Amino acid sequence: MQRERVSENVYWFQSDVYAQVTAGVIVGPQWAVVVDTLALPDETLGMRDFIERELSVPVRYVINTHYHADHAWGNCFFPGATVIAHARCRELLEERGRPSLETARRQN
């Protein structure tokens, strides 16, 4: 996973494995906001570990820009965070994301 500090309080992450998927973190004085998660668990866990170790703030919110697995399936790695998304994003996660996740679980 690639990581870059974009500005004083903004970090950019990019998957090394899947489709150059990107995610971001906006850091405040007491907590952080994650914008999308990465495609693979190891990469999203790497983001989380970086935030906890290097930035020393909890993630309070995760914003999903859309429902695709490579942007939203990592939500589960931020259990204390509130997930924010458009209502249609939630509907599509339920309609399409949940069946896709079940299929992936059966295949692995």
Protein language model features and the residues they cover:
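Residue-level preference for alpha-helix termini and adjacent loops
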Residues: 9-12, 58, 77, 88, ...
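Conserved beta-strand hairpin/beta-sheet module of binuclear metal-dependent hydrolase folds
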Residues: 3-50
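Generic detector of leucine side chains in alpha-helical contexts
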Residues: 38-40, 45, 55, 92-93, ...
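Acidic/polar short surface loop at catalytic or gating sites that assists cofactor/ion binding
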Residues: 85-108
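Intrinsically disordered, low-complexity boundary segments flanking structured domains
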Residues: 1-2, 70
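Surface-exposed, flexible loop/turn segments at secondary-structure boundaries
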Residues: 18, 70, 89-91
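Active-site metal-binding motif and surrounding structural segment of the metallo-beta-lactamase
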Residues: 29-31, 42-85
